[in-house]
Amino acid sequence: QADPNKFYGLM
């Protein structure tokens, strides 16, 4: 379950 929040952290 990939959370969108994690993606934001990469940004």
Curated annotation (Swiss-Prot):
Tachykinins are active peptides which excite neurons, evoke behavioral responses, are potent vasodilators and secretagogues, and contract (directly or indirectly) many smooth muscles. This is Physalaemin. Keywords: Amidation, Amphibian defense peptide, Neuropeptide, Pyrrolidone carboxylic acid, Secreted. The keyword Secreted applies. Expressed by the skin glands. It comes from the Eukaryota. The lineage of its organism: Eukaryota, Metazoa, Chordata, Craniata, Vertebrata. The keyword RNA-binding does not apply. The modification Pyrrolidone carboxylic acid is found at residue 1. InterPro entries: Tachy_Neuro_lke_CS (IPR013055).
